[in-house]
Amino acid sequence: MIDAPRIIVQVQSVYAGSQSLPEEARFVFAYTVTLRNLGRFNVQLLRRYWLITNGNGRQTEVQGEGVIGEQPLIQPNGEFQYTSGAIIETPCGTMEGHYEMVDHQGHTFRIAIPVFRLAIPSLIN
């Protein structure tokens, strides 16, 4: 039995009002992701996949190599944090997805990114 890597994913999002143009249906959000490796071996992030859903239910898929131009190696008990952004046409929406990673033995695996909200502050209850 393979010792499955233990990776914790935490995401925080914030509305970037200064970059948004609500009158043109352009709502910009920044999100910060923290990946923590609670396992005993190094893991490396290879690819990302995002499903972005706006407030009208319109979905956009985004995928590619690494994150912010990197394929970070995360050591045991280490973490990697990055900030990126998303633009949607409505004042609220959601994001979710997964990372494809590789362990120290070359086995690839996926880590889920739990759904999180994108919302302008006046809509958050």
Swiss-Prot record:
InterPro entries: ApaG_domain (IPR007474), ApaG_sf (IPR036767), Uncharacterised_ApaG (IPR023065). GO terms for biological process: error-free translesion synthesis. Residues 1-125 form the ApaG domain. The gene is apaG. This is Protein ApaG.
